[in-house]
Amino acid sequence: MPLLDSFTVDHTRMNAPAVRVAKHMSTPSGDAITVFDLRFCAPNKDILSERGIHTLEHLFAGFMREHLNGDGIEIIDISPMGCRTGFYMSLIGQPTESKVADSWLAAMVDVTNVIDQKDIPELNEYQCGTYEMHSLEQAQDIARMIIAAGVSVNQNDDLKLSDEILGNL
């Protein structure tokens, strides 16, 4: 099985909250696609609650689009990581890490401003596979944690696993 890019970085050295360019690629027509690792908490140390991350999934995707889309940038998808330490965001374009970080912080402020659980988008049995597994309170706690900590940048060169380590795993 091929080694995926996300497993060539040292998760023990990742800062969080932090933005990392996980991958650059181009479509056959030449459009730039960038995949970002939006690391909310330190791998193997913290984990996002399942209700909190699920509610963030519903809110974060829309709020990030409001703050980041435009000027040659269009978000394709924002999905939670299986390890529940963050999200992957795929988009058309190549925004800077600082622009992504600023948009992320603005989106977290938006999350804290949601007034009621009924204001969570697509919160119904027709549009959500586990519509009862949500917590606005937990999502807002996560958002406040991100705002308080700020968002830094993880550089791939600083996190790259050596061939020796990879060979021994």
UniProtKB/Swiss-Prot annotation:
Binding residues for Fe cation, per the UniProt record?
H54, H58, C128
For this protein, the record's InterPro entries field holds:
LuxS_sf, Metalloenz_LuxS/M16, S-ribosylhomocysteinase
Gene Ontology biological process terms, A to Z: quorum sensing
Q: Provide the alphabetized UniProt keywords.
A: Autoinducer synthesis, Iron, Lyase, Metal-binding, Quorum sensing
Q: How is the cofactor bound?
A: Binds 1 Fe cation per subunit.
State one molecular function term (GO).
iron ion binding
Q: What does this protein do?
A: Involved in the synthesis of autoinducer 2 (AI-2) which is secreted by bacteria and is used to communicate both the cell density and the metabolic potential of the environment. The regulation of gene expression in response to changes in cell density is called quorum sensing. Catalyzes the transformation of S-ribosylhomocysteine (RHC) to homocysteine (HC) and 4,5-dihydroxy-2,3-pentadione (DPD).
Q: How does it assemble?
A: Homodimer.
Protein family per UniProt: Belongs to the LuxS family.
Instruction: Write the protein's name.
Output: S-ribosylhomocysteine lyase
